[in-house]
Amino acid sequence: MFSHVMVGAADIEKSKKFYDAVLGTLGVGPGVANGTRFFYMTKTGMFAITKPINGAAASSANGGTIGFAAPDIKTVDAFHAAGLAHGGMTCEDPPGVREGAAGKLYLAYLRDPAGNKICALHRMPKT
């Protein structure tokens, strides 16, 4: 459905260190530089961080979340720990299981150094 997702960051180098760490836990290589942007590419899509091209301050979306798929609970926990170790802040509830319309999920939420809300999500098997 999506070709890419891009978020703004005032301190692009700080954000790159954060995303290199958290996305590295998911098997994604370091961000590739292109001007004032860094791109993280996989076979299924692309994530990018950028300084806003209009020169205005970067801001995070109120109510917005970007979710990254994780293959297992251990990876979700590693994603969360890497984020905290690289300038992220925990938000929402601690990492753990949530149940709802989407089924049983193991989730961990963070705010990146620019304030963008992200999460790692593992869909748990139906029992």
Please provide the spans of the model-predicted regions:
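Long, continuous compositionally biased terminal/linker segments
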Residues: 41-85
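Active-site beta-strand termini and strand-to-loop segments that position acidic
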Residues: 39-44, 110-113, 123
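Acetyl-CoA-dependent GNAT
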Residues: 51-54, 97, 123-126
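Core segments of cupin and vicinal oxygen chelate
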Residues: 7-47
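N-terminal beta-strand motif that seeds the catalytic metal site of vicinal oxygen chelate
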Residues: 1-17, 66, 124-127
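Vicinal oxygen chelate
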Residues: 10-14, 68-114
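A generic structural-conservation signal
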Residues: 32-33, 92-93, 124
